[in-house]
């Protein structure tokens, strides 16, 4: 018979951010005697839950999916765009072993470096800043033939906005005294994802054979001719860019090709056209045996070419680490946030880990939650308190959705009610944890209810915020709080409170030091 467990409980108050100003602040203006006393008397700190601290672009508000991924991973989990921006800013991009080896190989064998991708500042499939960094990397490492094959956007950017990008790269090549834009084509052809192989073939022939419907001396002239034909960026027909006397930029055996899109769905088809021996979408007039073909990120597991930035593997998330150490865990929330404390918290793993139980409480069936700001918190608290006292679990992770779901309605009075309801719930949870001689962490995944009106417009503020969130410790250990934390520090904090080893994959730091 196993001994009764003293659980460590993580309570996530969704949308419960920290803001000092009282105006339009449903959290500060609500009557919260329990949270007030905890904040005054218990070890506590504020932690970052937005922007680069959670792997989002700088200044971007946090969200529940990203928040829970970071909470469970114990490390910052970067989106591809942010990860690449950061790599370039820190200089690590320029020493990426896959990219540098591919360029060095071309330099050594006297071959061309072809760079292709969506030349756009849209940031959805690619970013031209990444392409610029790649051009600079190739030039710095001594590549003498650098050819940029520009796919034009007009979907994630205005329909006719490519000219500034083409001018920027034309100027860069002039400054380098080396390389050029070799072709332009609309994404409608190069980035099809619906097996319209007639479109892809036009792009493939342009790239491999320098064969296009149109030719121009320079990229801007080629674009202006397309506009004159009535083609917007997305639909620019295959155009070879080649001034009189210039060698063509067809792709040849031994050349290096680097594909600079980071989003996979619209690059799989054309990539397979290049690399699959058994490709049968259309008859390829020319099959190029590249020295190196590099995809920037992994476009598909079955595309067997080198990848500069493989997916960040989320091994040893908090839940998986508990399983490996034979610990029991419970995940509990209402419908609205159930996926967050399970799938997202587990780093995108759907199946529960061994020893992981789950309890789903149905959220109330109302049109909007301002009509029932307490949501299903009474039932959720009852089940949570029962689980804490059951002695079954080493760890319990619970999400209360009220602050976020009611915050999204923009109804200030309802948000105040939601926060006051939560205070009553926390009172019961604290009592249960103390009775079980356990430990409790109270935090949030991002802010919302602390800012219910937009000061700039005077309208209801229904979105998340970029503000920090509280972290409070209640328990049987004497601990000292550390400042400057973020969501990815919570999992290591929990492991240290349980006196467990922290896996090396977790780069977060414990925020409560046992004295």
UniProtKB/Swiss-Prot annotation:
Name the pathway it acts in: Carbohydrate degradation; glycolysis; pyruvate from D-glyceraldehyde 3-phosphate: step 3/5
Organism domain of life: Bacteria
Q: Which GO terms describe its biological process?
A: glucose catabolic process; glycolytic process
Q: Which cofactor does it need?
A: Mn(2+)
Any one GO CC term of the record: cytosol
Enzyme Commission code(s) on record: 5.4.2.12
* MF term (GO), any: phosphoglycerate mutase activity
Keyword hit for Metal-binding: yes
Q: Binding of Mn(2+) 2: at which residues?
A: 14, 64, 445-446
Q: Which residues form the active site?
A: 64
Q: Where does substrate bind?
A: 125, 155-156, 187, 193, 263-266, 337
Keywords assigned = Glycolysis, Isomerase, Manganese, Metal-binding
Substrates-to-products reaction catalysed: (2R)-2-phosphoglycerate = (2R)-3-phosphoglycerate
Name the positions where Mn(2+) 1 binds. Answer: 404, 408, 464
* Cofactor binding note from Swiss-Prot or TrEMBL: Binds 2 manganese ions per subunit.
Describe the task this protein carries out.
Catalyzes the interconversion of 2-phosphoglycerate and 3-phosphoglycerate.
Record note on quaternary structure: Monomer.
Q: Which family does it belong to?
A: Belongs to the BPG-independent phosphoglycerate mutase family.
What HAMAP family would the database entry show?
A: GpmI
Q: What is this protein called?
A: 2,3-bisphosphoglycerate-independent phosphoglycerate mutase
Q: What is the lineage of its organism?
A: Bacteria, Pseudomonadati, Pseudomonadota, Gammaproteobacteria, Enterobacterales
């Amino acid at each position: 018979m196993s001994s009764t467990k003293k659980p460590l409980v993580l309570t996530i108050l969704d949308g419960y951010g920290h803001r000092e100003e009282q105006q339009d602040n449903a959290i500060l203006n609500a009557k919260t005697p329990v949270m007030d006393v905890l904040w005054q008397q218990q070890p506590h700190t504020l932690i970052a839950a937005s922007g680069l601290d959670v792997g989002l672009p700088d200044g971007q508000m946090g969200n529940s999916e990203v928040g829970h991924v970071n909470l469970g991973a114990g490390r910052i989990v970067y989106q591809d765009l942010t990860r690449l921006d950061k790599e370039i800013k820190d200089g690590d991009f320029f020493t990426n072993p896959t990219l540098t080896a591919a360029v060095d190989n071309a330099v050594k064998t006297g071959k061309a470096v072809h760079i292709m991708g969506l030349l756009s500042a849209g940031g959805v499939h690619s970013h031209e800043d990444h392409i610029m960094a790649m051009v600079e990397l190739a030039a710095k490492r001594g590549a003498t033939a650098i050819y940029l094959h520009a796919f034009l956007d007009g979907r994630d950017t205005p329909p006719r906005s490519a000219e500034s990008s083409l001018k920027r790269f034309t100027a860069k090549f002039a400054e380098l005294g080396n390389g050029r834009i070799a072709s332009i084509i609309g994404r409608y052809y190069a980035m099809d994802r619906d097996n319209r192989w007639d479109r892809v073939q036009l792009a493939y022939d342009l790239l491999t054979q320098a064969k296009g419907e149109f030719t121009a001396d320079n990229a801007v002239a080629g674009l202006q001719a397309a506009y004159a034909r009535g083609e917007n960026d997305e639909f620019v027909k295959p155009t070879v860019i080649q001034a009189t006397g210039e060698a063509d930029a067809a792709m040849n055996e031994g050349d290096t090709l680097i594909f600079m899109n980071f989003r996979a769905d619209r690059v799989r088809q054309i990539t397979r056209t290049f690399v699959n021996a058994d490709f049968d979408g259309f008859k390829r007039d020319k099959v190029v045996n590249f020295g190196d073909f590099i995809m920037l990120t992994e476009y598909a597991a079955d595309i067997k070419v080198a990848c500069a930035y493989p997916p960040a593997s989320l091994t040893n998330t908090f839940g998986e680490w508990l399983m490996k150490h034979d610990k029991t865990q419970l995940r509990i929330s209402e419908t609205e946030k159930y996926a967050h404390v399970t799938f997202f918290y587990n780093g995108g793993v759907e199946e529960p880990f061994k020893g992981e139980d789950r309890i789903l409480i149905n959220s109330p069936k109302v049109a909007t939650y301002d009509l029932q700001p307490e949501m299903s918190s009474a039932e959720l608290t009852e089940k949570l308190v029962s689980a804490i006292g059951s002695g079954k679990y080493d760890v319990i992770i619970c999400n209360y959705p009220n602050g976020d779901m009611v915050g999204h309605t923009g109804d200030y009075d309802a948000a105040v009610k939601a926060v006051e309801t939560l205070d009553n719930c926390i009172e019961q949870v604290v009592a249960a944890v103390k009775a079980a001689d356990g430990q409790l962490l109270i935090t949030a995944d991002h802010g919302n209810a602390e800012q219910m009106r937009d000061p700039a417009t005077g309208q209801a503020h229904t979105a998340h915020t970029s503000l920090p969130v509280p972290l409070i410790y209640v328990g049987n250990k004497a601990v000292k709080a550390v400042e400057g934390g973020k969501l990815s520090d919570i999992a290591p904090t929990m492991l240290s409170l349980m006196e467990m080893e922290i896996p090396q994959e977790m780069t977060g730091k414990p925020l409560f030091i046992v004295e």
